[in-house]
Amino acid sequence: MERTFAIIKPDAVERNITGKVLDKIEGAGFKIVGMKKIHLTKNEAEGFYYVHKERPFFNDLCTFMSRNPVVVLALEKENAIAAWRELMGATNPANAEAGTIRKDFGVSIEENTVHGSDSPESAAFEIPYFFSQLELV
């Protein structure tokens, strides 16, 4: 079994659709092995998105991700990373396939409901950024 990391972003939490997103996750066969609702500080968001620090959207992304609470998740499934990326859909909800989370719930490229690890290396950094081994079941 492979693990991946996911965030239900502030836009989704603000719109009270966390439960709908979780239903899609579990309905797709993912096991939630870690979950908590947190409010990131700007510094925590900057540390998490450090790989994007030179990108022009970095500051706006960190401000957005720290504006309100998020739900962080560790997910488990065969080929979890690829399966989660497929369920999320394209970054831009307008380009996402029907039935994906971003197509169903996303508002814009920034407010696209969810984040997900894009590689095993990313998951290996992202999961322990938010979860200790004791919190993963």
UniProtKB/Swiss-Prot annotation:
GO BP of this protein: CTP biosynthetic process; GTP biosynthetic process; UTP biosynthetic process
Keyword Cell division attributed: no
Record key words, sorted: ATP-binding, Cytoplasm, Kinase, Magnesium, Metal-binding, Nucleotide metabolism, Nucleotide-binding, Phosphoprotein, Transferase
Main location: cytoplasm
Binding site for ATP: K9, F57, R85, T91, R102, N112
Cellular component terms (Gene Ontology): cytoplasm
EC number, UniProt record: 2.7.4.6
GO molecular function: ATP binding; metal ion binding; nucleoside diphosphate kinase activity
Coiled coil ranges: none
Entry-linked SMART domains: NDK (SM00562)
InterPro entries: NDK-like_dom (IPR034907), NDK-like_dom_sf (IPR036850), Nucleoside_diP_kinase (IPR001564), Nucleoside_diP_kinase_AS (IPR023005)
Active site (UniProt): H115
Cited SUPFAM superfamilies: Nucleoside diphosphate kinase, NDK
Gene3D superfamilies per the UniProt record, alphabetical: Nucleoside diphosphate kinase-like domain
Catalytic activity annotation: a 2'-deoxyribonucleoside 5'-diphosphate + ATP = a 2'-deoxyribonucleoside 5'-triphosphate + ADP; a ribonucleoside 5'-diphosphate + ATP = a ribonucleoside 5'-triphosphate + ADP
Pfam families according to UniProt: NDK
Cellular location(s): Cytoplasm
Family of this protein: Belongs to the NDK family.
Function statement: Major role in the synthesis of nucleoside triphosphates other than ATP. The ATP gamma phosphate is transferred to the NDP beta phosphate via a ping-pong mechanism, using a phosphorylated active-site intermediate.
PANTHER family given in the database record: NUCLEOSIDE DIPHOSPHATE KINASE, NUCLEOSIDE DIPHOSPHATE KINASE DDB_G0292928-RELATED
Assembly and oligomerization: Homotetramer.
NCBIfam families: PRK00668.1
Name this protein carries in UniProt: Nucleoside diphosphate kinase
Lineage: Bacteria, Pseudomonadati, Thermodesulfobacteriota, Desulfuromonadia, Geobacterales
